[in-house]
Amino acid sequence: MDEGGTPLLPDSLVYQIFLSLGPADVLAAGLVCRQWQAVSRDEFLWREQFYRYYQVARDVPRHPAAMSWYEEFQRLYDTVPCVEVQTLREHTDQVLHLSFSHSGYQFASCSKDCTVKIWSNDLTISLLHSADMRPYNWSYTQFSQFNKDDSLLLASGVFLGPHNSSSGEIAVISLDSFALLSRVRNKPYDVFGCWLTETSLISGNLHRIGDITSCSVLWLNNAFQDVESENVNVVKRLFKIQNLNASTVRTVMVADCSRFDSPDLLLEAGDPATSPCRIFDLGSDNEEVVAGPAPAHAKEGLRHFLDRVLEGRAQPQLSERMLETKVAELLAQGHTKPPERSATGAKSKYLIFTTGCLTYSPHQIGIKQILPHQMTTAGPVLGEGRGSDAFFDALDHVIDIHGHIIGMGLSPDNRYLYVNSRAWPNGAVVADPMQPPPIAEEIDLLVFDLKTMREVRRALRAHRAYTPNDECFFIFLDVSRDFVASGAEDRHGYIWDRHYNICLARLRHEDVVNSVVFSPQEQELLLTASDDATIKAWRSPRTMRVLQAPRPRPRTFFSWLASQRR
């Protein structure tokens, strides 16, 4: 364009030329003149750049909170925590888990070196305290969680013992004095444990009933167990869950239902016909959608068959393990309490855990509603429920993943459950509960809406794992307002955008990445933990520019007056 004259090229032609350029070239060309600057900010141009650069499906609309395509492109490019800023090497063995305080001022780490370390999260991260758990007969620490007001830390670990030992313990640590306040047994150790309220936590215990049949008992424990009266409860039984085919309850977590109607990001439901996952509402009155008890004639047929077997009048065509499972199912039919319904408007919570019904590997997610009157240790404990024949508690919902579950995490609003799983082959049949199907190397990241109990979107896939079923371990994931991140066995952490379902960053370590966690107050800060014994801190390019920008020199209060007198 001539100075002050008419453009030499029409806008439409400049637009067509800019369409053939990449994002960086478009921005550079926009510095040439005012006309090119105006075209370089065109909304249609940046919509094309966005879909092409990020390879987003064209039927996915723009993020509902975005004001323009240019700003949305900039958000995904500039606010993802992908710049490594600090490496922490204080652990001497594999780092297994990370957790942030709700304020974001502190975080905790657990490791195979059997310590729980508490860190101060500042511009430069520093170590505040290290608790050595070896004096308590722990083998290693595996999980931690801050309570709601950040005054207490729950730390979960594994006891020393034989390779097949499944016992663990939960410790509660004061964040004011770093004193150990209480310890609670936890079996199996991969129940992990979690907070239900600010001062009460959930632990597990396991009782064997048969060779492949057991009962998981979930307990509510008071974090402060130095009570003054023997009439004050420090523990209360929450639920008793029947386990079939060598399965157990593991990986407990609590979802608060109070924010379901005002989510940070509303995700659309996917097509249930294309998903291998099945969700059963066990508390529904609609018999057509309930994966619940068998019909009465089937129950009677099973009962008569077992009676004839016990009396020696029939020869079972089942293996000993299959026969045990049938007997356990029959026992549960008359000794399981139906799901208890909450009153209208009651503030309930969901207890979420992994379980199964076909094999020992966790392939289902159990969901049990916790009602307000169950959220306290007050009330009778010994002899509770003796007047009833109902021994087991029924679940409210079951999600069948059709694969090995290796990680779960909740969105900040608690409405969406994200699940890391390694799929079984299509049509796989479990003939022996001790020999689950082979699992895929690809990790699928599935998303479920806990309000509608439906799967949403398609599975995210980029990360990989290589260990077989019997060596498979947990890969912890985390969810922020806009992003979801996960570790992987391929020596990388991964970050996806929750709305567009695209992978935005790969974060490199020297070994398996076990855990990732966003700062709850600043999603542009992410921590990753690895088998390479390090914790890495990652910040966004935008944050790095702000932190590294030169600060103006302070001027004296009357400096402007002095300049006027010259």
From Swiss-Prot:
Residue positions, PTM Phosphoserine: S151, S284
Keywords: Cytoplasm, Phosphoprotein, Repeat, Ubl conjugation, Ubl conjugation pathway, WD repeat
Subcellular location, principal: cytoplasm
GO BP of this protein: proteasome-mediated ubiquitin-dependent protein catabolic process; protein ubiquitination; regulation of centrosome duplication; regulation of mitotic nuclear division; SCF-dependent proteasomal ubiquitin-dependent protein catabolic process
Pfam family for this entry, one: F-box-like
Entry's localization field: Cytoplasm
Listed GO MF terms: protein kinase binding
Pathway: Protein modification; protein ubiquitination
Record-level GO cellular component terms: Cul4-RING E3 ubiquitin ligase complex; cytoplasm; cytosol; SCF ubiquitin ligase complex
Domain of life: Eukaryota
Positions of short motif D-box: 303-311
Domain (F-box): residue spans on this chain: 3-49
Effect recorded for S151A: Impairs phosphorylation by PLK4 and enhances ubiquitination of SASS6
InterPro entries attached to this UniProt entry: F-box-like_dom_sf (IPR036047), F-box_dom (IPR001810), FBXW5 (IPR042508), WD40/YVTN_repeat-like_dom_sf (IPR015943), WD40_repeat_dom_sf (IPR036322), WD40_rpt (IPR001680)
SMART domains for the chain: FBOX (SM00256), WD40 (SM00320)
Family under the similarity heading: Belongs to the FBXW5 family.
Domains as described in the record: The F-box domain mediates interaction with components of SCF (SKP1-CUL1-F-box protein) complexes, while WD repeats mediate interaction with components of DCX (DDB1-CUL4-X-box) complexes.
Its biological purpose: Substrate recognition component of both SCF (SKP1-CUL1-F-box protein) and DCX (DDB1-CUL4-X-box) E3 ubiquitin-protein ligase complexes. Substrate recognition component of the SCF(FBXW5) E3 ubiquitin-protein ligase complex which mediates the ubiquitination and subsequent proteasomal degradation of SASS6 during S phase, leading to prevent centriole reduplication. The SCF(FBXW5) complex also mediates ubiquitination and degradation of actin-regulator EPS8 during G2 phase, leading to the transient degradation of EPS8 and subsequent cell shape changes required to allow mitotic progression.
Subunit annotation: Part of the SCF (SKP1-CUL1-F-box) E3 ubiquitin-protein ligase complex SCF(FBXW5) composed of CUL1, SKP1, RBX1 and FBXW5. Component of the DCX(FBXW5) E3 ubiquitin ligase complex, at least composed of (CUL4A or CUL4B), DDB1, FBXW5 and RBX1. Interacts with CDC20, EPS8, TSC1, TSC2 and SASS6. Interacts with TNFAIP8L1; TNFAIP8L1 competes with TSC2 to bind FBXW5 increasing TSC2 stability by preventing its ubiquitination.
Protein name (record): F-box/WD repeat-containing protein 5
Organism: Homo sapiens (Human)
